[in-house]
């Protein structure tokens, strides 16, 4: 019987290397040093280990999966915590983190900013494959379509020969011509034609020929032409002067 009792009291032999392979779990207290809510990890500043205060705080790594709390898991900077940790090749890592007395952690008020997909604003351009407005040709789900005009979507011609595009451009060009014709002539040497309001631009050759004509004329002819020109100007100014007097 004594031998049996002695056999029961003996401790079972431990496997060699088991105690060395298993990391020792320790208990510590401290506060959150910093925590990145977007990446989900941070560090705890441990000020007490196994109930013994530390002269210099020690950093302990903490991951959001080790936090004891509901909802979005995070830590607020300076938040007091209690935790168990172990030694790893990378340093000290927390195993389970709670609030004081085993209560749930409070967590941070910050939330990671989600990646919002910016919707492309419609710019009026079409898909060159199907003509749709909500996508480009590289995003088109249809097989390659026959080539067609990008302006009117017709397969009978290309945009360079599109009659609809040419018809839309003609009114704009004719309007530009009308505006050019309605503007007064701003030439440095205007010539009055038949007493009207139109004018023509004298090119260098015309100026030379006109100067030659004046040189061939006699002084009497030149004076007579000046007199006719003065009479014409008075006739033009006459009605304007009468209208001003009536008003």
UniProtKB/Swiss-Prot annotation:
Alphabetized, the UniProt keywords read:
Metal-binding, Nucleus, Phosphoprotein, Repeat, RNA-binding, RNA-mediated gene silencing, Zinc, Zinc-finger
Task: Cite the binding residues for Zn(2+) 1.
Answer: 127, 130, 135, 140
Pfam short name (any one): Lin-28A-like_zf-CCHC_2
Signal peptide interval: none
What the entry lists under InterPro entries is as follows: CSD (IPR011129), CSP_DNA-bd (IPR002059), Lin-28_RNA-binding (IPR051373), Lin-28A-like_Znf-CCHC_2 (IPR054081), NA-bd_OB-fold (IPR012340), Znf_CCHC (IPR001878), Znf_CCHC_sf (IPR036875)
Its GO CC terms?
A: cytosol; nucleolus; nucleoplasm
The compartments listed are:
Nucleus, Nucleolus
Major location, coarse class?
nucleus
- Which residues does the annotation say bind Zn(2+) 2? 149, 152, 157, 162
List all Polar residues biased stretches: 173-186
Q: Name one GO molecular function term.
A: sequence-specific double-stranded DNA binding
> Positions of the zinc fingers (CCHC-type)?
125-142, 147-164
UniProt lists compositionally biased (Basic and acidic residues) regions at 207-219
List all Basic residues biased stretches. Answer: 112-123
* Summary of the function given for this chain in its UniProt record: Suppressor of microRNA (miRNA) biogenesis, including that of let-7 and possibly of miR107, miR-143 and miR-200c. Binds primary let-7 transcripts (pri-let-7), including pri-let-7g and pri-let-7a-1, and sequester them in the nucleolus, away from the microprocessor complex, hence preventing their processing into mature miRNA. Does not act on pri-miR21. The repression of let-7 expression is required for normal development and contributes to maintain the pluripotent state of embryonic stem cells by preventing let-7-mediated differentiation.
Indicate the family of this protein: Belongs to the lin-28 family.
Protein name stated in the entry: Protein lin-28 homolog B
Gene source species: Mus musculus
What lineage, starting at the top, does this entry show?
Answer: Eukaryota, Metazoa, Chordata, Craniata, Vertebrata
What's the name of its gene? Lin28b
């Amino acid at each position: 019987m004594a031998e049996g009792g002695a056999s029961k009291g003996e401790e079972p032999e431990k496997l060699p290397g088991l105690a060395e392979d298993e990391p020792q779990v320790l208990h510590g207290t401290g506060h959150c040093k910093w925590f990145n809510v977007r990446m989900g990890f941070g560090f705890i500043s441990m000020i007490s280990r196994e109930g013994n205060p530390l002269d210099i705080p020690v950093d302990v790594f903490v991951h959001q999966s080790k936090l004891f709390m509901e909802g979005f898991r995070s830590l607020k900077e300076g938040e007091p915590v209690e935790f168990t940790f172990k030694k790893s090749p990378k340093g000290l890592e927390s195993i389970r983190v709670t609030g004081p007395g085993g209560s749930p952690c409070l967590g941070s008020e910050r939330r990671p900013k989600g990646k919002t997909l910016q919707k492309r604003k419609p710019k009026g351009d079409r898909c060159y494959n199907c003509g749709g407005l909500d996508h480009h040709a590289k995003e088109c789900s249809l097989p390659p379509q026959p080539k067609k005009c990008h302006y009117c979507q017709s397969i009978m011609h290309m945009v360079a020969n599109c009659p609809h595009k040419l018809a839309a451009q003609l009114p704009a060009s004719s309007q530009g011509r009308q505006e050019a014709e309605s503007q007064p002539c701003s030439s440095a040497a205007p010539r009055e034609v038949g007493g009207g309001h139109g004018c023509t631009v004298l090119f260098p050759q015309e100026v030379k020929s006109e100067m030659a004509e004046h040189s061939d004329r006699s002084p009497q002819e030149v004076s007579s032409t000046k007199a006719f020109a003065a009479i014409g100007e008075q006739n033009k100014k006459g009605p304007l002067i009468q209208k001003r007097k009536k008003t």
